[in-house]
């Protein structure tokens, strides 16, 4: 499994609530249509002044699957357009998963 990790800074004029509402609206509807998508998680950072406001993690079988999915023209344009409604900047990284704890023993 490969994770595509997006580190997101919100538009400065948005409150935390507005940021989350815009992110989880139409943008997520485009993301749900990405071919080969195995999972999508959004995390909103807490604290007084975190370096990022949110982290998005999408999961695919391979990096090639992720790159193909984000290259679908209609989806890429829709994701870009809706992202611009909540994000001032986004940094994207790929990470391979190495599970070290998968279930806590009692």
Regions found by a protein language model. Give the residues of each.
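Macromolecular interaction modules
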Residues: 1-106
